[in-house]
Design a protein with these regions (language model features):
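Alpha-helical interaction elements in eukaryotic regulators
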Residues: 7, 31-38, 230, 244, ...
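Noncatalytic linker/hinge segments flanking ATPase motor cores
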Residues: 13, 37-44, 179-184
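Non-heme di-metal
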Residues: 48-298
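Non-catalytic, surface beta->alpha helical segment in thiol-disulfide oxidoreductase systems
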Residues: 27-47
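Short amphipathic alpha-helical segments embedded in low-complexity Lys/Glu-rich regions
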Residues: 2-6, 26-28, 141-142, 266
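Thioredoxin-like thiol-disulfide oxidoreductase module
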Residues: 2-20, 44
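Short coil/turn linker and secondary-structure boundary residues
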Residues: 3-6, 33, 259, 290
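Short, structured active-site "lid" loops
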Residues: 13-33
Length: 298
């Protein structure tokens, strides 16, 4: 992001009408326009989204806060093969129908939502954000999300024997209304016609609000000594998602053009209400001995 050496008025004075014939500028495939439109774009654009030649090399590190999170993610690598679910099957047989319903909905939500998160990073954020440190982190997060999705799919495949039910759970973002509502909200706010800052905040809400109730519920199973494979995977994934949330917040703090306070409140309020509805209605806490009011407060 380099200051232009020739101001608009000076250029007009030097070149007159010919200034309008300057080559048309495109950035990331988007037509910006002529020289004057390009100047206006630079004045209004978010600096971290502006392409620079620095993005092609890792060093020198300019944003130590982002780099530290990338290195932390790098050190926490794991694979789906590390999760042993063999002992879970005996516990699964002993669970009540309500408890099984509870776990099925959690796994179904996670299996689909990780795909939405993956697509948003891969198709949007990783391409838009030009900071080397952020691009490094997103490369690792894409890997994380694939491992998470594989793990949740593996758990569904292991626990559920009926092929029709299994198919319904794998397609939960279109077949199960409470999960569909969460997916639709995420895709609404991830739409790349929206300002980057709004999309980044909504992304943080998915990782920090939409996931939190389900993580908490699985930790409740661990407290009861049930489903060790599921609980171990939950520890690994919740740790990863906590780091992803920290990164989104750190990046958001660096933005020069943040959403209005009203928009911020709207995004967070919607996310909280949807998650409260999901955790109380789709996952009826009271049916398995959890306190729905306390979960809602959480």
């Amino acid at each position: 992001y380099t200051k232009l050496l020739v101001e608009k008025d000076e250029l007009k004075e030097r070149c007159g009408p010919r200034a309008a014939t300057y080559p048309q500028v495109k950035i990331n495939g988007e037509l910006i326009g002529d020289y004057f439109a390009f100047q206006e774009y630079l004045e209004e654009a978010e600096p971290m989204l502006l392409p620079t030649m620095n993005r092609f090399t890792v060093f020198p590190i300019e944003h130590e806060n982002l780099w530290a999170l990338y290195k932390k993610a790098q050190m926490s690598n794991w694979t789906a093969e590390e999760v042993d679910v063999s002992a879970d099957m005996e516990d699964w047989k002993s669970l009540t129908d309500n408890e099984k319903h509870f776990i099925k909905y959690i796994l179904a939500f996670f299996a689909g939502s990780d795909g939405i998160v993956f697509e948003n990073i891969n198709n949007n954020f990783a391409d838009e954000v030009q900071l080397t440190e952020a691009r490094s982190f997103y490369a690792y997060q894409v890997h994380n999300e694939m491992v998470h999705g594989e793990t949740y799919s593996k758990l569904i495949d292991k626990y559920i024997r009926d092929s029709a039910e299994k198919k319904k759970l794998f397609e939960a973002i279109t077949t199960i209304d409470p999960i569909k509502k969460k997916a639709e909200w995420a895709m609404k706010w991830f739409d790349n016609s929206r300002p980057f800052a709004e999309r980044l905040l909504a992304f943080a809400c998915v990782e920090g609000i939409f996931f939190s109730g389900s993580f908490c519920a699985i930790f409740w199973l661990k407290k009861r000594g049930l489903m060790p494979g599921l609980c171990f995977s939950n520890e690994l994934i919740s740790r990863d998602e906590g780091l992803h949330l920290d990164f989104a917040i750190e990046l958001f703090k660096m933005l020069q053009n943040k959403p209005s306070q009203d928009t911020i409140h709207e995004i967070v309020r919607e996310a909280v209400e949807i998650e409260k509805g999901f955790i109380i209605e789709a996952l009826p806490c009271s049916l398995i001995g959890m306190n729905a009011e306390k979960m809602s407060d959480y």
